[in-house]
Amino acid sequence: MSLEISGRELIKSKIIDAPECSGVYKMLDVSKQVIYVGKAKILKKRLTNYIKSDLDNKTLRMIANTYFLEYIITHSEVEALLLEAQLIKKFQPKFNILLKDDKSFPFIKLSLDHDFPQLLKYRGKALSDGKLFGPFASNTQVNTTLTELQKIFKLRSCTDNYFNSRTRPCLQYEIKRCYAPCVGKINKENYRVLVIQVKDFLQCRTRELQENLSKKMQELSSQMRFEEAAEIRDRIKALSYVQLKSRILDVVKNADIISIVHKDLHYCIEVALYRAGQPYGNIPYFFSSTENSTHEEVLEYFLLQFYQKQQVPSEIIMNHEINSKENVIEAIKKINNISDLSIIVPHKGDKAKLVHKAEVNALFSLEQYLKKITKNTEIMFEVKKLFDLPEIPERIEIYDNSHIQGMFAVGVMVVAGKIGFDKKEYRVFSLSSRNFTIGSEIELRDDIKGDDYGMLRQVLTRRFTRLKNEPNKLPSLMIIDGGKGHLTVVKEVMDKFGMNIPFVCMSKGRDRNAGLEQLHMQGKEVFTLDKNLLVMKYLQILRDEAHNFAIKNHRLGRSRAIKISSLDDIDGVGEARKTALLHYFGSYKAVCNATIDELAKVKGISKSLASMIFNVLNRKISLDNS
């Protein structure tokens, strides 16, 4: 491939025709991968900055890697902000400040499309069939809140299918976590009262709620309904206890507190969530390699990326100002189709104290993060020396597979780096045929059936095919769970794709004992390491993570396939008989545990059909226990 100009000369040539208006520009590398997306109030002026002599090292590296430059004209700065945020999210350019951990926060969902609404944890977009409360910063916090709610209000948490199949109360009723509406232990009217009380509690109308409960308790007492009055009394006590644990603030109602701190080319942004005056937890976000980036730039990038996915409060309270604040507000409002949003930076008062608290938490989080990086970098240096790598590995990919005699086969890829395991980059490769019926084996694809090497060949072929479109995710080192034969397969697939990635195969030693692992590399004799060496322990941790991830996904796929098909695919068991079985026994598990005689008692199930069902389900149980 021949390119006439690149880098600084390319930018100079583009400046000549660049317009003097707002817009977005993209820098692309030699393989036409987007490496940077930027916005500008005036495109010509912004591009001119890249040919100055006082640029930092990061910008110089970016320019040196630029072989193509494209720009898009926008009607306004706000439109440029919006487009820039969308393109960064789409292309994830390596020279941009990226929000890598952008998973959605969990909520508590109260389903309202059922006579007896369900209370459960929920992730995702707002739905029309329920009301969401949150967001919560972690699963722990939402689970703790749900547990408290179930103790106090005893609303159901089961699925509609499970609810509809019950013929007797489940364990939740026995441990006083549910009123068992599924079998008529509570009527619709009384259940609706509980639903309203849950709403009041989650919207922090607790004073009003407690007053209403006190009145109800007195009313029941005057009617000599002492058992019901005692239950209301216990509910009031439980609510008071929960309130003591979670202080409700008057100073903020619906806000995100955001503080940014900086140390050693690393930023941490701590987000504390407050809804209805109640703290819903906080979570840190880290940004690295931000050489010469300012607090304002990092915060602006963060806000525009963060609020593309997360719920926007009515107020964002920060410890640092940003450039073009009004434009950022307008962009966030347009992204989320909202009309009410303010961003403030308080310098005194209660809100300033909350910001300072978030800043202290951010500093602590950043210090812990940097300690983790330092420790992992030291280990990575040992890995570099051990395998004679050209540089400290940035990305290590570990591969393993799991199956039972070729059934439910999966291959997995686990990724590790200086910040530890990068779970967002984990991948699962399904290696089984999708055509599964009870009574027939789940077949591997023809080219890999019963062949461990064939499975690895399939996984690597798919991985390298994808790598052609993701050159920025090229691993520094690959570790494969296997021995000498696997070494040959890896080399064969690499040669086919023209790849030259350092790799090592790691096999269990004598009697498959941990600590006796053998390492296989091209052109070297098989060798082992002292099991007490830090680098050996690290390699074992990597291998075990891949192994556990493979087993988890194998079992998940096996359980899902069998559970779906165990009843659905038995000849003679249609929807009516399946429903009859579930209604009679109360759950799928109870059907599996039933004897032939018990199965035959269900209306529509003959003795011969009961025998067939019993045999199929027991085959499933034997697989689950293997």
Curated annotation (Swiss-Prot):
Sequence intervals crossing the membrane: none
Entry's Gene Ontology BP terms: nucleotide-excision repair; SOS response
Ranges where the GIY-YIG domain occurs: 20-97
SUPFAM superfamilies per UniProt: C-terminal UvrC-binding domain of UvrB, GIY-YIG endonuclease, RuvA domain 2-like
Pfam families: GIY-YIG, HHH_5, UVR, UvrC_RNaseH, UvrC_RNaseH_dom
Leader sequence segment: none
Family from the record: Belongs to the UvrC family.
Protein name: UvrABC system protein C
Organism the protein comes from: Rickettsia typhi (strain ATCC VR-144 / Wilmington)
